[in-house]
Amino acid sequence: MTLAARLKQEFVSGWKPFEVVWLALFIIAQIWAYVQTPDSWLAMISGISGILCVVLVSKGKISNYFFGLIFAYTYFYVAWGSNFLGEMNTVLYVYLPSQFIGYFMWKANMQNSDGGESVIAKALTVKGWMTLIVVTTVGTLLFVQALQAAGGSSTGLDGLTTIITVAAQILMILRYREQWLLWIGLNILSIFLWAETPAIYLMYSAYLLNSLYGYYNWTKLVKRTN
């Protein structure tokens, strides 16, 4: 298959009209937020690339990792400017490496879907849920203490969102549907964390809506796999 054919399959095939409108509205909203409050062009780029990334993830498209890489680089500097140490460490040690690891993990587990390709999705077992809850709780308590010792801002909320992000990112790489439940919780918390940065605040609001759709769509992918 030629490069042009692969790009067409990835970005044109398998899209529903409302998904295209959904994505366009999110991007327009990001640009509007920057025009209204031009606080940081990096925040705008981070917001747009982040929205492209999560919408592609919700559809199970492997191209999400390209936009995820752009998001990771720009978001790091935005978090740095806000002194959110937990978010900075998340980008450096979770988001960046996971873009490369996730790409190769997904590449080996793709299937034809609605004229395009989508990832083969899985669902957590009861044992998996128990492990997730214990590890997330203990990890949050330990990381919040570390952030307080380092003098970070909003350490409780910052620490909680960081650990949830790590857990959700791992579930995403491993292709588990339940990542979306964590993303829903994370996006609600992040809306409060970034309340004073309009572009990022709006980005997480868009993420919240997309994560609801992502859970719905991945439930269909799990059923298709089974």
From Swiss-Prot:
Keyword field: Cell inner membrane, Cell membrane, Membrane, NAD, Transmembrane, Transmembrane helix, Transport
Topology, Cytoplasmic side: 1-14, 58-65, 111-123, 175-179, 224-226
Membrane topology classification: Multi-pass membrane protein
Record's subcellular location: Cell inner membrane
Segments traversing the membrane: 15-35, 37-57, 66-86, 91-110, 124-144, 154-174, 180-200, 203-223
Binding residue positions for beta-nicotinamide D-riboside: W183, N187
Periplasmic side: 36, 87-90, 145-153, 201-202
Induction context: Repressed by NadR.
GO molecular function: nicotinamide riboside transmembrane transporter activity
InterPro entries to which the protein is assigned, alphabetical: NMN_transpt_PnuC
Tree of life domain: Bacteria
GO cellular component, one term: plasma membrane
Described purpose of this protein according to its UniProt entry: Required for nicotinamide riboside transport across the inner membrane.
Family: Belongs to the nicotinamide ribonucleoside (NR) uptake permease (TC 4.B.1) family.
Name of the featured protein: Nicotinamide riboside transporter PnuC
Lineage: Bacteria, Pseudomonadati, Pseudomonadota, Gammaproteobacteria, Pasteurellales
Gene: pnuC
